[in-house]
């Protein structure tokens, strides 16, 4: 692959400082690692991703711009306060959320959370007013909402996320395993960790998914949050596959090891650290970061921009896929319908990719077995692209 060259051009002197403009020269695109042109890249920006929502086929455009984040904690005034040690109005996060829901109204409600470990399941129901949930400690790791649950956990006697209702299934299931689930619109979070502490292999099953956070309502903003798990850590998607919801993650941290950012929603990861953990899989298997199930009528799935992709646990170089398409509810290639079945969409741009990323083929076959293909394909062409990335895993 042709190497990328960056050149810096001095454009002005301001206050004694030289201001540089960086221009990225085009990288040769390959069939297995397609790169956007500068012109095409203008179609895949934060503004484009987050401009529209609603029913696919008749999306509503409101040009939502969340890039300012949720605001400074110093400017918040808590309507409800939570402290695990009993020094505040509520001891659990869910109790404060329930109080905000029961109070009704449409005004934004602020819930402060004192540093501590909150071992509980959290549901922000669809009926909730706009809620800002924030940790008082600026270190997100000091305020953790954590629970141990997973897809194969026996359902009998197990608690499941209350946003999901009851089920007759023998096991908890993927989404019911979520430590926290947000179904309301206009949810904001800051200075918090959402974690699923399930230890994979506790229960035998090929699907060891254990969700830390599921975002199912529109216009969610999460700033300085950590979302930690292994398989299926973070889900973004509406309750209906025909509906587009949006989430914006700013200066946040997402960790996992298999398909750990997944779903049919539209999400932007801006200035985030996306970290693969080799603690469970080690060097024995290639894995995947993104697993989008974007509907074919939605041009925007996941965007990572100005972000860092790295690893912990010393996985081998050139081993990790950036992603694969999650062909949700499609059992195999014979059941895949071009233009109707899901066709995941991801763009990674202006980001730093660590050496663990596969160089020649960073995008894997879909979950239904569709071979990765970017053009002239038997099945729907994959919608995975890169632009202007750097680092040992960028292929540049």
UniProtKB/Swiss-Prot annotation:
Gene Ontology biological process terms, A to Z: cell wall modification; pectin catabolic process
Site (Transition state stabilizer): 231
UniProt cross-references to InterPro entries, sorted A to Z: Pectin_lyas_fold (IPR012334), Pectin_lyase_fold/virulence (IPR011050), Pectinesterase_Asp_AS (IPR033131), Pectinesterase_cat (IPR000070)
Catalytic activity: [(1->4)-alpha-D-galacturonosyl methyl ester](n) + n H2O = [(1->4)-alpha-D-galacturonosyl](n) + n methanol + n H(+)
Protein name in the entry: Pectinesterase
The species this protein was found in: Ralstonia nicotianae (strain ATCC BAA-1114 / GMI1000) (Ralstonia solanacearum)
UniProt entry keywords in alphabetical sequence: Aspartyl esterase, Cell wall biogenesis/degradation, Hydrolase, Plasmid, Secreted, Signal
Entry-linked NCBIfam families: PRK10531.1 (NF007822)
EC number, as in UniProt: 3.1.1.11
The keyword Cell wall biogenesis/degradation belongs to this UniProt entry's keyword annotation: yes
Active site positions, chain numbering: 232 (proton donor), 259 (nucleophile)
Annotated positions binding substrate: 174, 324, 326
Function field: Involved in maceration and soft-rotting of plant tissue.
